[in-house]
Swiss-Prot record:
Name of the protein described by the UniProt record: Putative pre-16S rRNA nuclease
Lineage: superkingdom: Bacteria
Pfam name, any one: RuvX
Organism: Campylobacter lari (strain RM2100 / D67 / ATCC BAA-1060)
Chief place of localization: cytoplasm
Length: 128
């Protein structure tokens, strides 16, 4: 069983993979040029890793929660993914990733976003 986690932002999509609910790792982030390009790159990951579950971060709370959730759900609909999709609270995931000090915050290469996806994927499966 393989699960792909997505931290969907307007400029970057953080990506992480979990295998057999036991081993998780961040993958290379997707730099968004447009919605369709980003969706196609996510589809490549889904096919390459034979993914059967998606865990998608959505921010809970705050004034933009409804708008962001709608954007995230619309993006997921572009994937034509017919297997399980779970939406999880991604609040503070980027902040928690920053606190690990493992990424250069000046670079906008998506490593922070993939680390955030990795963290909420680990939490989803209760991994340490």
């Amino acid at each position: 069983m393989k699960t792909l986690a997505l931290d969907i932002g307007l400029k970057r999509i953080g990506v992480a993979l979990c295998v057999n609910k036991s081993i998780a790792m961040p993958l290379e982030a997707i730099i968004r040029k447009n919605r369709n390009q980003a969706a196609n790159e996510v589809k490549k990951y889904i096919k390459e890793y034979d993914v059967n579950t998606l865990v998608v971060g959505v921010p809970l709370g705050g004034s933009s929660e409804d708008e962001m959730r709608k954007r995230v759900e619309h993006f997921i609909s572009l994937l034509d993914f017919d297997k399980e999709v779970f939406f999880v609270d991604e609040s503070f995931s980027s902040k928690n990733a920053q606190e690990l000090g493992m990424v250069n915050l000046k670079k906008k290469d998506g490593k922070l976003d993939s680390l955030a996806a990795y963290l909420f994927l680990k939490d989803f499966y209760g991994l340490t």
